[in-house]
Each structure stands twice: as structure tokens, then as C-alpha cells.
């Protein structure tokens, strides 16, 4: 997916988990895709091209500053891999600073403000402390604040004011950073739904497409994927390990929640909730067997349906 996005002009690649971002860097290196030149980046912290994309990651195991400074810490690996990192709290930022000092390098950081998702991000009343910490570290050359970012909670609900309210809180966050002497070169807020249905959020410097990259609509009641020009790009495949004939009235799987109304053929697929299939999918989730459309019957087991 990363290479496909780059071919279409993507200059940033967002990966949630730090360990995934490190793997992506290895993959890009093997494909001959190198990070932005360090000297050029120092001159232009927003620099990113489709040939030398930036990798941004935002979920990292919690570590203290002392742990972050250790040679094998994930944060030091991230800095060696030239990853952009997110900080929502002073504690996380201090860990990034410690890793940067240990690596004798500059960390490129995206500060996150919570504008209404109530997930990661500093509350507006706490953002000033985070900004002051960042400004001091930036003046010492340990970090560069690349961006202020946030995430939309209800962008798929196009007729309510929540997204506009989040945008206003985001702008307040920008002012708090400006008051601390931080001028961020990159601003990003819009998700797939924001990009599609809230142009004010998409008018910033970067949009983060998530569900849209998988070819799905954020809300099919607003617009179906095909109406948006989106096509699903993923599917899960497995071979049937057994096909058997059962009699009418025979219960299938735990609790016999589904019983055959007539004599039936059933097939066994070696995938279950241990592989990510929801347990709630029983008796309704669609399956294609060859070109024949059918559905899961009986409860989803750990390793079989």
C-alpha cells in the first residue's frame, strides 16, 4: 500500500504503531526508497516528497526518559530510522527529548491536541505546558516541532456542528503554540470523512486517509463506497479444510445456536476469532465459496468457522 500511495503522489505515510513504522522503514529501504536528506530537512522541516516520503507514527509503548535513553529503546530506533513522532503529554515529549540527546540528533515531533475525540492528545488547558516544554527543547536543538494535529470524532455526521467546533478548538491550539513561540509548518486534522465532507478541515496542510485507503466509505448512509469512487482492496482467503453433510435439526458449533432447517452441506474454514473474525459475526457474516455467496453458521470458534 505504501508504494501504491507514493505512486499517486503521497509525500507522508502514517503508521499507527511504532513497531509497524520501523518495519515500513525497512521495507522502503529494501525497495530503494530513502528518507529525506538530513541537511535538507534541517533547512525545511516540512520537506517531504513522493520519492522521499516521511513516516509519521503516533502510538508507542510508554517509557520513562531514562528508559528512552537506553541504546536499545524503541524511541532511539525510531530516531535512527528517521521517523516523525507524536507527543500528547510532557512525559512522552521528555522521553523523546532524552532519546534525541542520547542519539545526538534532532527529533521531529508532531504535538497532538485533543479537540473532542477524548482519546490521545493534550487537553487545551494542558497544551500550554506541553508547548513550553517543546519550545525549550526546540531552542536547544533537541527537537523540531513539525506539526500540531488532532483527530475528528464525528466527521461522518455531516449535519451536526461537532466538526466545526473541533476545528475551532484546533485553531485555539495553534494560538497556544504561537504564544509559546512555536510556528508549526504542518497542520493536519482531516480524516477520510473530514476530507470528503468537511472542506474546512481538509484545507489545512495534510489529510490523513484511513478507512478510505481500504476502499470503504466512512458512513454508507451518507454515501456508498462506489458512489465515492472507492473500491475495497482487501479480502481474507482460506481453503476449506472439510465439507460435510448434516441432517435437518443438527446444531452447529458451541451452544447449537444455529440448527440446520433442512439437510445441508457445510464447509469448515480454518479461521476464527483468534484471527480477527468477530464472534458476533455468527449466523450472518457473508462468505464466498468460489462464486457462491453464503454466510457463517454457528458461533465463531477460536480457530474455525
PLM ranges: what are they?
Residues 1-188:
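Active-site-proximal beta-alpha core segment in soluble small-molecule metabolic enzymes
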Residues 7, 20, 39-43, 61-65, ...:
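Active-site anion/phosphate-binding pocket segments in diverse small-molecule metabolic enzymes
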Amino acid at each position: 500500500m505504501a508504494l501504491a500511495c507514493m505512486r499517486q503522489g503521497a509525500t507522508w505515510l502514517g503508521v499507527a504503531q511504532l513497531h509497524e513504522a520501523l518495519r515500513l522503514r525497512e521495507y522502503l529501504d529494501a525497495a530503494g526508497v530513502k528518507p529525506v536528506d538530513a541537511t535538507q530537512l534541517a533547512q525545511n522541516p516540512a520537506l517531504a516528497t513522493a520519492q522521499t516520503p516521511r513516516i509519521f507514527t503516533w502510538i508507542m509503548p510508554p517509557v520513562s526518559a531514562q528508559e528512552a535513553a537506553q541504546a536499545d529503546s524503541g524511541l532511539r530506533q525510531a530516531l535512527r530510522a528517521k521517523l516523525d513522532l507524536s507527543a500528547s503529554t510532557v512525559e512522552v515529549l521528555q522521553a523523546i527529548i532524552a532519546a534525541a540527546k542520547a542519539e545526538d540528533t534532532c527529533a521531529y515531533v508532531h504535538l497532538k491536541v485533543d479537540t473532542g475525540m477524548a482519546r490521545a492528545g493534550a487537553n487545551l488547558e494542558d497544551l500550554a505546558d506541553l508547548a513550553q516544554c517543546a519550545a525549550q527543547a526546540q531552542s536547544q536543538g533537541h527537537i523540531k516541532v513539525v506539526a500540531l494535529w488532532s483527530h475528528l470524532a464525528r466527521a461522518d455526521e455531516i449535519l451536526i456542528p461537532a466538526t466545526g467546533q473541533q476545528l475551532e478548538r484546533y485553531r485555539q491550539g495553534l494560538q497556544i503554540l504561537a504564544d509559546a513561540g512555536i510556528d508549526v509548518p504542518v497542520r493536519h486534522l482531516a480524516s477520510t470523512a473530514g476530507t470528503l465532507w468537511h472542506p474546512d478541515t481538509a484545507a489545512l496542510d495534510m489529510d490523513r486517509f484511513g478507512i478510505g485507503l481500504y476502499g470503504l466509505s466512512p458512513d454508507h448512509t451518507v454515501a456508498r463506497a462506489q458512489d465515492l469512487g472507492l473500491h475495497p482492496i482487501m479480502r481474507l482467503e482460506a481453503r476449506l479444510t472439510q465439507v460435510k453433510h448434516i441432517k435437518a435439526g443438527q446444531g452447529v458449533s458451541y451452544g447449537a445456536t444455529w440448527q440446520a432447517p433442512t439437510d445441508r452441506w457445510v464447509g469448515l474454514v480454518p479461521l476464527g476469532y483468534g484471527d480477527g473474525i468477530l464472534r458476533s459475526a455468527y449466523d450472518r457474516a457473508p462468505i464466498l465459496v468460489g462464486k457462491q455467496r453464503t454466510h457463517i453458521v454457528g458461533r465463531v470458534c477460536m480457530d474455525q468457522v
